[in-house]
Amino acid sequence: MKTNIFKDKTIKTIEKFILSTVTMRQILECEVQINDEKAVVSNYEMRYIDKVAKRVLIEQGETSYKDILKILNKYKVLSWDGFKGNHPKDVADGTMFTLEAVVNEDKIIYATGSQIFPKGYHEVYKALREIMKPVN
């Protein structure tokens, strides 16, 4: 695992946040976009439409920017940078994830795993999903 180089252990700003989840049958991208003091959380599913991969909005919700920062800092998402959860050799399939984020103006967080997740991953994913509602 890569050494975490962030001196400040809290996220103060979010410039980019995409948490991708891949299973055998589904690819989801949970994206957080900041607009002033509001945060829009969107969940997209990759679907093939007319033989072309398209990013289709399936869930969306809005909360305060402060609430998103609380979630990410509570579960120490900044410490996930460099996480690489290699797939267990005796597991046939499972769930893979990738986090790509830019925070605190220019700090990149990149984490990836397959059936092995950083501490707090499931709680962050659940908290983000609870903000969203299905889009018709």
Predicted regions and their residues:
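Short, flexible N-terminal segments of the mature chain
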Residues: 29-49
